[in-house]
């Protein structure tokens, strides 16, 4: 997967930079950010080839961290815009619920567009779970006419992102066959783009069949999503 975050200078209370590029271990940064509390003032600054991070809490406690900078020899991948055959916006909390349910049955998910309907499906040794997504839970939807699309993606990478539902209320998915899932979270002065490579299925016949998603398959019951 590829994560690209663009933060404009207006997003910060104060911002001074001379165009530097720095690299550090993201795993260490995640551990530090777990110590953040609401209304804490955070400061990032360069100090003698180290990234210095300070937290000033409401009770006047102060924590200071220093991260060593590293050199990255690998080429930095640049994100590319993707125009999906289907694009929709959904509540991050709702998608988190669906992804958590899918993980009960497998570690990957099929996303299917068929006859103007959207489906999510997870399969495993203990059975299958198919969810028909009602349009009512979508804030926006753009779909090509007569689209038939089926693609598979790892659930864990989506799960990492949807756990941010307390911070980001909505996200947008742009989906096209045989290209990475493109997830976008965009707010004022802030844009996050997340690319997840599709998984290749070993069952070619299953990939080509849409019969399980015909309306007749659902005529005996209603699939309701809260």
What is the meaning of each model-derived region?
Residues 1-104, 110-226:
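DNA polymerase sliding clamps and clamp-related checkpoint/processivity subunits
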């Amino acid at each position: 997967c590829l994560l690209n975050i663009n933060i404009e200078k207006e997003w910060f209370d104060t911002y001074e930079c001379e165009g530097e590029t720095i690299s550090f271990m993201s795993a260490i940064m995640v551990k530090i950010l777990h110590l953040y509390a609401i209304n804490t003032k955070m400061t990032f600054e360069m100090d003698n080839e180290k990234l210095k991070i300070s937290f000033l809490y409401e009770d006047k406690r102060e924590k200071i961290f220093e991260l060593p900078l590293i050199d990255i020899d690998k080429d930095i991948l640049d994100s590319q815009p993707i125009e999906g055959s289907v694009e929709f916006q959904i509540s991050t909390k709702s998608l988190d619920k669906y992804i958590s349910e899918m993980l009960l049955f497998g570690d990957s998910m099929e996303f299917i567009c068929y006859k103007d309907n959207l489906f999510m499906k997870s399969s495993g040794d203990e059975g299958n779970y198919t969810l028909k997504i009602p349009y009512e839970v979508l804030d926006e939807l753009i779909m090509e006419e007569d689209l038939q699309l089926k693609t598979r993606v790892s659930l864990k990478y989506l799960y990492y992102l949807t756990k941010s539902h307390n911070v980001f209320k909505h996200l947008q998915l742009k989906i096209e066959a045989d290209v990475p899932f493109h997830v976008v979270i965009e707010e004022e002065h802030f844009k996050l783009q997340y690319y997840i490579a599709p998984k290749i299925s070993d069952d070619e016949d299953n990939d080509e069949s849409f019969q399980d998603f015909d309306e007749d398959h659902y005529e005996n019951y209603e699939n309701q999503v809260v």
